[in-house]
Amino acid sequence: MKIIYQEQQNECGICVIGMLANAIHDEKYVHDELLEQINLPPNGLSLFEMESYGKKFGLEINSYQLTFQELKELDSKFIIVHFKDHFVIVKNKHENSWEVYDPAKGKYLLTDEKLEKLWTGYAATVAKAFKEIPPVNKSNFFSNFFDFNLVTFYVFIELIIIGISTLLATASRTIITNTVDFGTAVNLVVLVVYFSCLKGLNLLLQVILQLIRNFLFWKQYRGYLGWIIQSLQQKSFVYFSNKSPNQLIERQFYLKEVLSFFNFYIPNLIISCVVALIIGVLIGINQLEFLLIAIAQIVVNAGLFCYDFFFTKKITKKEIPYVELQNKISLQLDENLREEQNKKRFNFLMLNFRKALLQNQNINNQKEINRLTIENIKSFFQQGFDFAILGLGVIGIIEQRYQLSFLFYVFGIQSLFSTYATRIVQFGAAINIYHYCREKLVNLFIETKKDEGIKVNWQCPDEISLENLSVTLNQHVDLANLSLKIKNETVIFGQNGSGKSTFLKILTGRGFEYTGNIKFNNVDLKRCSKEQLFENVYYLKGQNLMQTEANDFGFSEALFNNQNPHIYQLLFDAGVQNQTKLSSGQKQILQLFLLSNIKNKVILLDECMNAIAPEIKNRVYQLLVKPLTLNNFVVLVEHDLSFASEAQNKINLTNYLRNS
């Protein structure tokens, strides 16, 4: 553990927090940074304040008043110990020796006797916890994701590589000048060996740089991804109810692009500006025509790059809908082949699938043709510029304006100049992508919709009352001015399209607009927060049977808590103990069984018994549904009412339909 030394007597607490954060989270806090982040009282931090600030730095600090023997028995890697007006960190290194990290004196050892004399009887254990995530927005986005030290390191490494390349180009001029009189064969050997070594060294340096970059990039990426996932764990239910899982997963792509912008494009811009300026001046001083060729090469490369960028952007916009359609139809085909046998629907899906595949293939062909065309055009112009430089060089040598060595020198630095100058243009496209990805990442941290409800004291209702409830079911049929009193264990039934499922979904408080009032006892449904309703109102749909094994959703725990042998017999008779593959009826029995330990909730069952065999349906109702009504408020929607002879109340929703 590295010591952070205090500069004032009251700073020991913040230094201790900083040292622990650095050791546990591999952070790099320094003294001045800690002073900025912690509001330091004149008398220093107390143990209670250290507990509070510890959460900000990802530390779970719990303080105690102990005997010395209890201190020795504490199971914690690091322990904060309070001396008189001072805090230190200790580790029990040996049986009678303590390793002390003191922000005032540094690192030293204390025996049990000496530590006991200095100790005041107060200590705190330290454990790793989630760091508090500050709100991320556009104004602080740069400071949260930009690592100045890392960018400086990248620039430094690449400058070394460029310096070596420039020195080698300069050395080539000297070597050729000094060997020009040795004869043609010697010159040829020198040039071949020299340029082979030059190219090999340059490639080696580039590979080393890329390996270092990749290692540091992925280390940084994993850290930021963990930071984002940690921040998501602090979000409310409302946040997740307004964001699909795909929105959260795709942020990994945006994170990569943002980090690439900071760690690749910004260093490249800095390097490119420096190199283009210095080498451009060097070329211009030696020979203006070579500078003009380099500028022409930059213009052509920039034009080709811009065309490729905008073409790819345009074609990708066309591609996305067809890719989404292809994925959607793939899922439907999978369902058709696994869950049903419908040749007519299969042919229809295959027809649309082929159309989507053909469109995607055409788009991919266009992208590939564009890529090859750009590469060939770029190669053609590169060859043309090389011949132009060579031609000018030969003419210059014939006219004795400069020597052969100068031509090789210009070849080297002119190529370097055009390469790095073109990167400046590429930076413009990177900015475009960065702004888009930044917007997406910022939106990840923002809860755009607030929970407008008010958290009331939840109590399982004895009655749900509807007062002048009106809701449109479709264009012409609705429930208008519906006033009802719904009791526990009520069964809702009615003709198809009478709004039974819609009626239950309205009671969840999510997804449907209605007028009038819905009250749980005397509490209006609209006064409850979405998070509260999600926690206390269960809506189960009989057709939504995603679980395929009895192990799903805590089957073993439910079995352990069950005290009724008749339920064990029911599960055995229904074959639910066969955990490899369940039928629809078995899944419904499992679904109801897993509710058996729920209490003080509103449970809405939407045809959750329609697939259960008629001979055991009444047993299922008596053993799994009816017990739920003892500790919960249960409303059912069913077509088959043979089991519901004992239900307290039945409501035929067909009688309340109105044609508009």
UniProtKB/Swiss-Prot annotation:
Domain ABC transporter residue range list:
464-657
The record places the active site at C12
For this UniProt entry, what's an example GO CC term?
plasma membrane
Q: Name one GO biological process term.
A: proteolysis
User: Mind telling me which Pfam families this protein's record contains?
Assistant: ABC_tran, Peptidase_C39
Annotated InterPro entries: ABC1_TM_sf, ABC_transporter-like_ATP-bd, P-loop_NTPase, Peptidase_C39
Q: How does it sit in the membrane?
A: Multi-pass membrane protein
Q: Where are the transmembrane segments?
A: 150-170, 188-208, 265-285, 290-310, 379-399, 402-422
Can you tell which superkingdom this protein's organism belongs to? Bacteria
What UniProt keywords apply to this chain's record, in alphabetical order?
ATP-binding, Cell membrane, Hydrolase, Membrane, Nucleotide-binding, Protease, Thiol protease, Transmembrane, Transmembrane helix, Transport
Q: Where does the record place the Peptidase C39 domain?
A: 6-126
State where it is primarily located: membrane
Q: Which residues bind ATP?
A: G494, Q495, N496, G497, S498, G499, K500, S501
As one GO molecular function, the record gives: ATP hydrolysis activity
Query: Where, per UniProt, does this protein localize?
Result: Cell membrane
UniProt xrefs under CDD domains: ABC_ATPase, Peptidase_C39E
As for family, the record states: Belongs to the ABC transporter superfamily.
Q: What is this protein called?
A: Putative ABC transporter ATP-binding MG390
- Which species is listed as the source? Mycoplasma genitalium (strain ATCC 33530 / DSM 19775 / NCTC 10195 / G37) (Mycoplasmoides genitalium)
